[in-house]
Amino acid sequence: NGAVMPGGKRTTVEPKDGGNVELTLHADLQHQVQDLLDARVAKHQADWGAVVIEDVATGHVLVMADSNSKEPDNAKPQKVHAVQDAFEPGSVGKLVTVGAALNQGTITPTSVFQVPYALNLSDAGGPITDFHEHDGETLTATGVLAESSNTGTVLIGQTIGDDQRYAMMRAFGFGEETGIELPGESAGLIRGADQWQGRDRYVTMFGQAYAITAMQEASALATIANGGVRITPHIVKSWTNADGTVEVPQGSQPVQAMDATAASQLLTMMESVVEDDRGTAGAAKVPGYRVGVKTG
């Protein structure tokens, strides 16, 4: 009841003024994207969805929309899917394979491949196929990415070693936390190349048999657009202490994840996903803008 016990000690902690935190989020963008995301999740009856938009030059997260977002006055704990849930990236993972091959110089954007519908590989446990059946095609590496060909990506992946692909995954930050200022971040799930057995060796080339978060995926795409330099993403721009001093978060040192020339080539190849007549993202065209995409 608050009464002091005889012989007891009283400890008083003086109140301390709190500070102010300024986020990197763009309020208008966040609101619009949140509405669009909620509508798409409802339309497709998905379990959840997340959208991350990152400024590639600064690492500032302009949007982090999550389908389970609640009103700000609801203080109950809730999961942030964008940083806490990992998933297989699927065909977005083809960027890692193509990027690694460009980085090693085993291909160029115009390298030509004879791409079948199915590849029968002795150690794959069954054929590797494309999403849709087709006759054999002659495609450049750019065409392989534009059409999102599984078999074409495997042919590209076979020009480099498994260790080189794994090194590119790690260079993009897969398998480690991004360092964003949010608790409970998942590092994703990725096994070393020496643990890729049978079919896993091939399906990792197109984004299966490993898992990353939406934040990791956004960071990897930002790295490509930033000349191959990976920087720590931030959702906190600064904070002001009670004494008026302003501090900004410090991330880890930038990492040159891939050669700048290779990154530029890959970014241009991503534009073909939108611009090519057989590209998988023609609907993403925005008049007056160059748009680079990889569908998943």
Walk through the language-model features, giving the residues of each.
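Beta-lactam-recognizing serine transpeptidase/beta-lactamase-like catalytic domain environment
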Residues: 3-9, 51-87, 96-296
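Extracytoplasmic/periplasmic proteins that interact with beta-lactams or build/remodel peptidoglycan
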Residues: 1-50, 70-73
